[in-house]
Each structure stands twice: as C-alpha cells, then as structure tokens.
C-alpha cells in the first residue's frame, strides 16, 4: 500500500452527527523522521469524547473541517527510527482515523498481546481505567454498599457495575430501554435495574435501592443525577464522570 486512507471531518456538526459530516480521503504514506515510528492502525476506539472534540477545545485542541478525525488506536509498528521500538511491536497511540501514522516514539505506549486486542482499548484502555479508578478511588465502595451507576450499559458504566459486584456490593444500573436493562441483569449480573425511559424514575429508583445509595457513579448528570442525590445515604460518595 502506497497511500494512507483517512476518514476526515468534512464539516462540524451543529446537531445530530451523521455520515455527511465525514469524508474518505487518501494521502501519501507518512514517512517517519528521526525519533519517530511508522504505525499500521489495527483497531480504533470510538468514544463519546469524539463528539465533544467537534464542539471546541477541551483537554485537546478543537477539531477543524478537513482534519483527520481524532481518536486513539491499537497499532502495530511497521518501521522504526526510534530506539526501543521494532517492527511488530504493539502500541496504543493517538493516530486518528487512518490506516497509518508516523508519530514520535515518546507519544506511544507499548502494549502486551493478551486476549482479544479489542480489550486493550476497552477493559485495559480508557474506559476500563476510568471505571476502575473512578469507582475504587473516588467511590470507595465497601462490601454490602449499594452502588448505583447511570449509563450502565455503556463502556464505562458496564465495567463500573462489574467491578462493584467483585467488591461485594449491591449494584443498580440505570439505562434506557428494556433490552439494555435485561442485558445488565442476565449477562452482567446487576442486582436491579432502572429504565429511565419507562417513566417514574424516582419510584423505580426507590424500589431498586430501598436502603438508599452509598455510591453513585454519575455518567449523565441532569434529572438522573438529581434523583440519585435525593436517595444518597449519609456519608455517601458521588463519582462524576465526563
């Protein structure tokens, strides 16, 4: 392959994101300079933060039309002009949505090949680290605590619930729709669920957490956060994510 296929941001969305906001382009294959590594992108992480980057500067510079869509990936080293990296090495890198990228070695994080490669972007990646440290360091759950998590069927929320179960907690997941709620209980072992789309949020929450809430992991804010705050026990902890 002599060209680099890219998915670029064609225009900045003002409302709902759609295919019309992206464009497929081809660019010359990047050539790594001294201290850089040429990468072949294997898997790209699609995250909720991607949408926020289109709205303006956050913890990273704002995206502009015509740029390669930003995003992290698991990539394989193709060629290296940097010590410590060799062809075949697996890395996490902020490559963007493209087939290849040449990046400074200092921006790469080596990865160990273990299990499905997709786990390096999820369980061992940003979602997993967010869930693990957000729950255990901020939420500080104890065995027997009631832990409630919103957006429970999402990448972070689903991991929060599973970690809380390992800690011996009663876990309540808040999600939208019967299918998501059923998945949380049958596949992930949540003790109770709240379907915010079904109405009567406060009543559902009271039934799911009759002893109150000791830890609330908030992924959404708004009305759901407010409802959970009114159910918090004395000394309860709230971890705000996002």
Which residues does each PLM region occupy?
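NAD(P)H dinucleotide-binding glycine-rich loop of Rossmann-like/cofactor-binding domains
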Residues: 69-76, 87-151
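Mid-domain Rossmann-like dinucleotide-binding core that forms the NAD(H)/NADP(H) cofactor-binding site
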Residues: 125-198
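Terminal peptide-recognition signature
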Residues: 6, 41, 131, 164, ...
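Glycine-rich cofactor phosphate-binding loops and adjacent beta1-alpha1 units
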Residues: 187-188, 192-242
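Short glycine-centered segments of the SAM/dcSAM-binding site in methyltransferase folds
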Residues: 90, 146, 170, 236-238
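Glycine-rich beta-strand-centered segment in the early N-terminal region that forms part
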Residues: 28-46, 54-97
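Conserved "cap/hinge" positions at secondary-structure junctions
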Residues: 79-81, 95, 151, 175, ...
